[in-house]
Amino acid sequence: MKPIPILVICPRQIDYFNCQTIPDPETYEFHFLDAPLELSGFSRNFDLMAYLEECRQYIRQYDIKVVLATRDVPSLLQAQLSQEFKNLQGASVESAFLCLHKYYTHKLIDPTPIDYAVWKLDTDRALSEYLEEIKIPFPWMVKPCTTACSSSIVKVNNSKEALDAISIYQDIIVDNLSYLSPFLQTYLDSKQYPLIDSNPILVEEYINFPYKCCVDGCVSNGKIVIWGISDSHYFMSKPECFADFTFPSTLPESIQAKLNRAYKEILQRLIEYGFDNQFVDVEFFVSHKGEIKVMEINGRMIPISASLYRQCLNQGDPYTALIQIGMGCQPKTPTLNGLVGGIFYITTFGKDIAENLLDFEIAKSIHNLEIRVTPEEKITEIGASGFPLATVNLVGNSYEEINQQANSLRRQLLKQPEFSPWN
């Protein structure tokens, strides 16, 4: 049987690895079309419209049957391509956009949104004018509306910190996110979504709930399939710095059932906007009493979870499932096999070139570790969440076992421990 030609757009390192190690690899013929897109979603030189045309030509030339997008911005491209090519499956551009754009997620998809507001960046505007618009009491969580991977998030406790954050955003956001505008203005209605003509910053009330988790799954021909729930953990000394997420969740069954119901309600709203044939994960805050609030929605799979799902689930490989969806087949609901796993972040608060912060020699020798920087890359912008240099996937028989492994690896890999998240 001839292998299925599959195009992976804007691939990251982990996509190459996951496609090479996919079950039954002889079934597929993977093609990769690289792009100058950072994990954060930032880019100074990415011509999105030219890349989209390159995708069209590639699909025709190689008779591509499935297009895989495992990142936030590429999910928009995959959605548009699925509208243009009859043999491709995917979501509508509008529904993919509503997952990406955090302001419109709250406005149109989140059933019970937290308090939120938005700033439209303008370099000619006095900084003090921004503060007058926000009626939310401090503290705030502030973030660009269209970045990924928890990038450029800042916790703001007072007016001075708010002004500092705005000043930083004015310096970096316009240059790094403007590449999105031509695509959004072409395929969306600017009267319906006026923020696509600006570089907006989301301001949210700070939610001090003790638990954070993620419900992951997909929509296939209009049917919702839940993959599972993972727990997110943050460093106690730096509560905005993401430490890891572990799978499966240890939350009580009653709360997990409530999360699954909330997930399905959100996906039904997305389906009304045309969301289909794609993975989607929803991140939630969870209180001691079981109250839940939406953090954000990601309209794509979690590629770093693939190895974890493959080891902790029966029939749980998300790449295989996404290909099945792309071929018009509904994937089976996976089941737990008794193992536990986690994705652990190797994060720094240091500012230096990456090779002075991370031991690349050790990192390259570790199985299931994704390096997120190049040795010569300069790390200069550090928000409240720190800067993730790498992630490592660990699986074992207990959470205690994998946490001990992760703590040991962090201490081996970080060259400047004084800037580590646990200090």
Where are these regions (language model features)?
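Conserved anion/nucleotide-ligand pocket segment
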Residues: P139-S159
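A short beta-strand motif that forms the metal-chelation/ATP-contact edge
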Residues: Q78, G290-M301
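A short glycine-rich, hydrophobically flanked beta-strand micro-motif that places a catalytic Asp/Glu
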Residues: Y273-H288, W422
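ATP-dependent carboxylate/phosphate-activation module, predominantly the ATP-grasp catalytic core
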Residues: E205-R269, G274-F275, N298-A321, G326
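ATP-binding N-terminal substructure of ATP-dependent carboxylate-amine bond-forming enzymes
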Residues: M1-L98, R125-E129, G328, T348, ...
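Glycine-/Pro-rich loop/turn segments that contact NAD(P) or position catalytic residues
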Residues: A96-D115, E129
